[in-house]
Every structure is written in structure tokens, then in C-alpha cells.
């Protein structure tokens, strides 16, 4: 949605899903979520997008620590503005139950991880701002994030 809004406003952009940049197996010992691979790929992919003319790059994913944040900014090659999308945990878990209703083990992992991640992100507090997305539409979330980052004026008021 953020990429669509930027494109609709005529802003050259790229959207990068960090999960796909880390998706390989096995992860090295001590790197549970293969962050090192994600960073290597981010450096290349972001550089390619910038060379192709992207002036806004949106990253979608989880960054858990200040060190990881700094490493992502370094790999991105431009200053990073970080938003935490906050959704009430019971709603997160209800959505996970729908998404993984026929995947028992996968569902249990995601349910446990959602609580773990909520605690980690709350304690780390490495975001520049937080958007409570519990009751917002996807479009409203995207517009709020883009406006808060300072890219206001790109979209007509709605």
C-alpha cells in the first residue's frame, strides 16, 4: 500500500520485504533469524534501487535492537526513519489463528512469537514513532506512516 501511494503520487520508490531477504536455510549459529544474510542482500538490493532512481525506499520487517537498526541503516545507505505498527495482542493472535488455522505447529510458533516480539519491541523502544493500527484500515495506516515520516503533501486529504 505504501508503495502504491508513493507511485500514485509520482514518487520513484521501492518496497523491500526484509523477511524475503533473509529467507534461506539453515541460519548460521547465533543468528536465529538470519539477519546477516538479510543485511547482505539489503545492501545490494537497496543500492540497485537507488541506482535505478528510487528516491524513497520502504522496508517492511522487524528490527529488534539498536544495533540491528544501525546495521540496517548502514546497509540501506540512507538515513532510516523507523515506525512501529502497534496492534493489540489479542487482535494479532486472532488474525494469526485465521491465517494459520490448518497449520497447528506453525500457528503455535507464531502465537508464542507474537508475545515474545511485543515484549522485545516494547523494551527496545528503537522506533522513531508508533502508529496504533488496531482500528485503522491498511490505507489509513500507510497514509499515517508516510505523513509522519515527513512525506506529507504527497496525498490529498481524505
Where are these regions (language model features)?
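A structural preference for long, well-packed, hydrophobic secondary-structure segments
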Residues: 1-7, 25, 29-30, 52, ...
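Conserved substrate/cofactor phosphate-moiety recognition/catalytic segment
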Residues: 3-47
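Conserved nucleotide-binding/hydrolysis micro-motifs of P-loop NTPases
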Residues: 20-21, 63-65, 86-91, 137
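Short, hinge-like loop/turn segments at secondary-structure boundaries
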Residues: 31-35, 75-77, 99-103
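Glycine-rich phosphate-binding loop used to anchor ATP phosphates in small-molecule kinases
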Residues: 37-80
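Conserved phosphate-donor/acceptor-positioning beta-strand/loop module used by diverse small-molecule
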Residues: 76-97, 131
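Small-molecule kinase domains that catalyze NTP-dependent phosphoryl transfer to phosphate-bearing small molecules
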Residues: 101-144, 151, 156-158
Amino acid at each position: 500500500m505504501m508503495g502504491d501511494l508513493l507511485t500514485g503520487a509520482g514518487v520513484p520508490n521501492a518496497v523491500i520485504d526484509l523477511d524475503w531477504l533473509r529467507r534461506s536455510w539453515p541460519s548460521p549459529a547465533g543468528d536465529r533469524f538470519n539477519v546477516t544474510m538479510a543485511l547482505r542482500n539489503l545492501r545490494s538490493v537497496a543500492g540497485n534501487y537507488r541506482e535505478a532512481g528510487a528516491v524513497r525506499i520502504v522496508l517492511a520487517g522487524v528490527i529488534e535492537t539498536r544495533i540491528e537498526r544501525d546495521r540496517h541503516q548502514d546497509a540501506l545507505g540512507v538515513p532510516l526513519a523507523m515506525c512501529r505498527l502497534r496492534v493489540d495482542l489479542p487482535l494479532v493472535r486472532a488474525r494469526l489463528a485465521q491465517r494459520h488455522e490448518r497449520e497447528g505447529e506453525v500457528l503455535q510458533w507464531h502465537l508464542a512469537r507474537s508475545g515474545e516480539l511485543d515484549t522485545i519491541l516494547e523494551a527496545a523502544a528503537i522506533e522513531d514513532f508508533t502508529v496504533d493500527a488496531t482500528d485503522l484500515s491498511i490505507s489509513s495506516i500507510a497514509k499515517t506512516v508516510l505523513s509522519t515520516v515527513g512525506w506529507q503533501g504527497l496525498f490529498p486529504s481524505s
